[in-house]
Amino acid sequence: MLASGLLLVALLACLTVMVL
């Protein structure tokens, strides 16, 4: 469960960087 959470955060960060 922790690994999927970290993966979700990494994906969110990637999207944020693309938007910025």
From Swiss-Prot:
Record's catalysed reaction(s): an organic molecule + reduced [NADPH--hemoprotein reductase] + O2 = an alcohol + oxidized [NADPH--hemoprotein reductase] + H2O + H(+)
Membrane topology value: Peripheral membrane protein
Induction remark: By phenobarbital.
Chief subcellular location: endoplasmic reticulum
Keyword Glycoprotein: no
Enzyme class name: oxidoreductase
Molecular function GO terms recorded: metal ion binding; oxidoreductase activity, acting on paired donors, with incorporation or reduction of molecular oxygen, reduced flavin or flavoprotein as one donor, and incorporation of one atom of oxygen
Enzyme Commission code: 1.14.14.1
Top-level division of the source organism's lineage: Eukaryota
GO cellular component: endoplasmic reticulum membrane
Localization in the cell: Endoplasmic reticulum membrane; Microsome membrane
Cofactor(s) needed by this chain: heme
UniProt keyword list: Endoplasmic reticulum, Heme, Iron, Membrane, Metal-binding, Microsome, Monooxygenase, Oxidoreductase
Protein family according to the UniProt entry: Belongs to the cytochrome P450 family.
Protein role: Exhibits a high coumarin 7-hydroxylase activity.
Record protein name field: Cytochrome P450 2A7
Organism: Papio sp. (Baboon)
